[in-house]
Amino acid sequence: MKKIYDRGHEIGNHSYSHADYTKISAEAITADLDKCDGIVESITGERPYLMRAPSGGYNNTVVKAAEDSGRMYIQWSVDGIDYGDAEAQDIYERSVRRTQNGDIILLHNGTKNTAAILPKILEALECKYEFVTVSELIYKDNYVIDNTGRQFQK
């Protein structure tokens, strides 16, 4: 994590326990996020403020718990569906074909074919888009989120 952070990548919070946040209380969500934040901060020196729930499972309680504890809930807009036995070419097609300006692509580390196909995905996208951190991408205030999870400035 430290090497990734030191290369300029942003580290967010994806939970400590990987629990289904839609089935636990706001207090339990906050405690779980705090535990993860403490670990990230001990490694990077910076406490994350962005968070995404495990499996993308969220509801009003999850979003409010994040906001009430000074965090911002984020979600992805393109899913590479790279888990399980996903074939590299399928991951590539889903990731590249569906991506538009402002998208956040969901890919996982430790999956069967993601690491092998990632350079090809990056090469295809870097000629069309500028890669930025999530903090650089999102609006921090005066915004609305539509039913697809896309953020728009008011």
What are these regions (language model features)?
Residues 1-106, 110:
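Metal-dependent polysaccharide deacetylase catalytic core of the NodB/CE4 family, i.e.
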